[in-house]
Amino acid sequence: MNLWLLACLVAGFLGAWAPAVHTQGVFEDCCLAYHYPIGWAVLRRAWTYRIQEVSGSCNLPAAIFYLPKRHRKVCGNPKSREVQRAMKLLDARNKVFAKLHHNTQTFQAGPHAVKKLSSGNSKLSSSKFSNPISSSKRNVSLLISANSGL
């Protein structure tokens, strides 16, 4: 009886020390359900997205939007009109950033690299930028109080 108990203990210790082998494969980070409803205010704050295809343990086609605040993810139905609109917005935004990044040059100044914009005209129209003075009542009141002191 003692020999049988000793064999079970040895087998138990060897099983605990042996590395675990997972037959399931790689862990997949995927959406299992859609967030509903997703507001346009949330979708336009996303900084990027990716399309989830149906494969492996991910059994739902989805658009995963990555939000900058607290590294949150929002899963949307890729057939939804708001989700498609947000994907087009992000594609256009990334295209503009890629063009701006293409127009930069890197100069080596000592141990630090400095990026400098090219001397060419900017591709962004001036209508994209709002006037900071007219957009905020606080800025207007600051200008009035600064001018009254003259």
UniProtKB/Swiss-Prot annotation:
Disulfide bonds: C30-C58, C31-C75
Keyword Magnesium: no
One of the record's GO molecular function terms: chemokine activity
A biological-process GO annotation: positive regulation of cell-matrix adhesion
SUPFAM superfamilies: Interleukin 8-like chemokines (SSF54117)
Tissues where the protein occurs: Specifically expressed by thymic dendritic cells. High levels in thymus and small intestine.
Location within or outside the cell: Secreted
Entry's transmembrane regions: none
InterPro entries associated with the record: Chemokine_b/g/d, Chemokine_CC_DCCL, Chemokine_IL8-like_dom, Interleukin_8-like_sf
CDD domains assigned: Chemokine_CC_DCCL
Keywords: Chemotaxis, Cytokine, Disulfide bond, Inflammatory response, Secreted, Signal
Gene3D superfamilies: 2.40.50.40
Domain of life: Eukaryota
GO cellular component terms, A-Z: extracellular region; extracellular space
Residues spanning the signal sequence: 1-23
Cited function: Potentially involved in T-cell development. Recombinant protein shows chemotactic activity on thymocytes, macrophages, THP-1 cells, and dendritics cells but is inactive on peripheral blood lymphocytes and neutrophils. Binds to CCR9. Isoform 2 is an antagonist of isoform 1. Binds to atypical chemokine receptor ACKR4 and mediates the recruitment of beta-arrestin (ARRB1/2) to ACKR4.
Similarity section: Belongs to the intercrine beta (chemokine CC) family.
Protein's name according to its UniProt entry: C-C motif chemokine 25
UniProt source species: Homo sapiens (Human)
Taxonomic classification: Eukaryota, Metazoa, Chordata, Craniata, Vertebrata
